[in-house]
């Protein structure tokens, strides 16, 4: 049976939230990436938009875990997500773009659901697959803080690439997606899944990749996507950040 990249990204995406008073909350999305340390130790990395975490004033947010029951049911069980220690951010941000990453301790089922680092597009993926204006992409998130059901799964939405050119990435680090971006979408993955099925005996989906992170809404209600290569770069910065954080 073929594995669907869409389902795998739904399973790897989580809600991030923090109460903001008067019954309101700051809500966004993040997704988990399996990115082993340089010495080969397993590591689960949470990827999201930097502005989402910066908007949260308290040191602790909540992350929306989901757990499967033996009868096919699902249970939504949000848990604590420390994002600062005594006011100092625990996440690492890309120095130029709205991307944030942090190493987290995830439940075993979520550590298994984390997508491989290799699924993130690199600097040649768009050209290799001929991606351009009009191509359909998908994103998952929590628009206006809503989930697809009480189990806390994200909502899937689609849009088309709405800008040109999209490469070279060094000159065009973001691209536009024709989708109405609402509060709660920020930080979610944007991906190509037209050919995103994995054949038995192969490791990765064919012709599918995570194109970037949804990071901004324009006044035209068009989404701004930051290319995934900058997620890769931010993850590389994690090792230095972790060393500096040691007492």
Pin down the residues of each PLM region.
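Short, surface-exposed secondary-structure edge patches
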Residues: 5, 35, 126-130
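Residue-level recognition of beta-strand microenvironments
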Residues: 33-35, 164, 193, 216
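Serine endopeptidase catalytic core focused on the charge-relay Asp
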Residues: 10-14, 18-19, 26-27, 56-174, ...
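Catalytic nucleophile loop of clan PA
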Residues: 176-213
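Cytochrome P450 catalytic-core helices
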Residues: 48
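C-terminal tail/extension regions appended to the core domain(s) of diverse proteins
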Residues: 216-247
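A conserved glycine-rich beta-strand in the N-terminal activation segment of trypsin-fold
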Residues: 19-45
């Amino acid at each position: 049976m073929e594995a669907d990249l869409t389902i795998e990204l739904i399973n790897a995406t989580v809600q991030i939230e923090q109460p903001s008073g008067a019954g309101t909350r700051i809500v966004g999305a993040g997704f988990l990436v399996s990115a082993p340390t340089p010495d080969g130790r397993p590591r689960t990395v949470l990827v999201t938009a930097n502005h989402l975490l910066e908007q949260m004033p308290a040191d602790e947010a909540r992350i929306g875990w989901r757990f499967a029951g033996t009868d096919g049911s699902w249970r939504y069980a949000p848990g604590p997500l420390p994002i600062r220690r005594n006011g100092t951010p625990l996440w690492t941000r890309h120095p130029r773009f709205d991307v944030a990453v942090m190493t987290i301790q995830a439940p075993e089922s979520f550590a298994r659901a984390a997508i491989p680092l290799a699924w993130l597009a690199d600097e040649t993926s768009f050209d290799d697959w001929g991606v351009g204006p009009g191509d359909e992409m998908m994103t998952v998130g929590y628009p206006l803080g809503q989930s697809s059901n009480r189990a806390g799964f994200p909502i899937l939405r689609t849009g088309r690439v709405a800008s040109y050119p999209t490469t070279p990435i060094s000159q065009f680090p973001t691209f536009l997606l024709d989708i109405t971006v609402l509060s709660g979408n920020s930080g979610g993955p944007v991906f190509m899944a037209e050919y995103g099925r994995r054949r038995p005996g192969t490791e990765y989906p064919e012709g599918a990749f995570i194109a970037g992170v949804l990071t901004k809404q324009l006044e035209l209600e068009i989404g701004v996507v930051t290319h995934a290569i900058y997620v890769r770069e931010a993850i590389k910065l994690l090792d230095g950040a972790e060393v500096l954080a040691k007492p």
